[in-house]
Amino acid sequence: MLDSPYVRRVAISLQLLGLAFEHEPLSVFRTFDEFRRINPVVKAPTLVCDDGTVLMDSTLIVQYAESLARRSLLPAEPKALQHALRVTGLALAACEKSVQIYYEHTLRPEEKRHGPWLDRVTAQLLEACGALERELVEKPIDSSAGGIGLAGVTVAVTWHFIERTIPGNVPPERHPALARFSREAEALAEFAAAPHGPGTFGSD
């Protein structure tokens, strides 16, 4: 489902790489049994390759896709790659923590939530977003389709997920560069074709 930031990350990256794909909007919760028939591990995103091989994890799927496209969404120059990997790592950390907070509030009954754990995860999320804000201020990322790259996709998708699912946890006024970059990226055709939500890639 495109309500998963990891699924969106892959869908957008595949488009940027010029690779055609079919999207089956399955949920690890709402369509668990159907998902399990495709991948018994029930992990999103899952990619079924042309030969039937099943791949998991957004980073690994994008890595495989890059081999098919024979080009990378990461820069080759070591210093530029170092920066892109740092930004990508921070964005993935923020993504992981935001998903944990979202699940805690939507799946676990209130009386069973562990306050200290939620506080710790929220603190980690804020640190990651704060670091991302500083990175974008010091070294802005190109938000065009030709320049956004994997780091930019990951940042934009993560911030959009935060805004849509746990908006009260990360104040946008304290992260103006993040918010602005995400808005610019969401205006790209590749992002618009894979909107956050329960829909299908490419549907109007």
Where are these regions (language model features)?
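GST-like domain detector, emphasizing the conserved glutathione-binding G-site
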Residues: 1-115
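Non-transmembrane alpha-helical segments in soluble domains
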Residues: 62, 66, 85-88, 129, ...
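C-terminal end-helix/capping segment
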Residues: 173-194
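Aromatic-glycine hotspot motif
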Residues: 47, 59, 125-133, 190
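Carbohydrate-binding/catalytic loop surfaces
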Residues: 199-204
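Class I S-adenosyl-L-methionine
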Residues: 11, 15, 133, 163, ...
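GST-like fold's C-terminal all-alpha helical module
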Residues: 91-180
